[in-house]
């Protein structure tokens, strides 16, 4: 199934930190986004629709592992050794793009006592939706992008919440909003609105990228955040 990280991650509050208009293909803009910042189910649905609409899904070999890749100088081709289940295969390609999606696999830390812990334990990328956190004492290890999203979602229902972090990140309120049916209908009828908004968002993010390369330029933002 297509989706990558948006297929694997289903924790409470899972979504994108980039506005939906930009976090989509320029050749496949959508008027279906319910919020300015899309949620995980919507992004997964969008990726599935795009893969089907453009005939990509039928070309994907799911469950296939790339075991070896070697460049054949004589033929100017890549020789790819693959494995699907117990069946091995070989393919030739002019171009190879490594898009292995490393963040689709949960990275479990090596912590003392982890193996002997008797309570419920799971990674945010392998969220146990059958386990009710209501009234529980919960410890969250790490404050990456996932924790920033799910901690506010579970905090109101748990009895105690302890968050352990190595480095505290700066977190600003997300300027999200419900787009509503009227906005979606308007975008569908006048695609130029979304295209213009997409360009505006891209420009603003490019300004932020400049600030990341030149930290002094972000000092006003840092001051406002404090």
What do the PLM-derived regions correspond to, one by one?
Residues 29, 67, 73, 87, ...:
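Residue-level detector of flexible, active-site-proximal loop/helix-junction positions
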Residues 6, 33, 71, 78-79, ...:
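Tryptophan-centered motif/residue detector
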Residues 1-60, 165-168:
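Beta1-alpha1 glycine-rich phosphate/pyrophosphate-binding loop at the start
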Residues 2, 21, 65, 76, ...:
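Residues that flank catalytic or metal-binding motifs in active/ligand-binding sites
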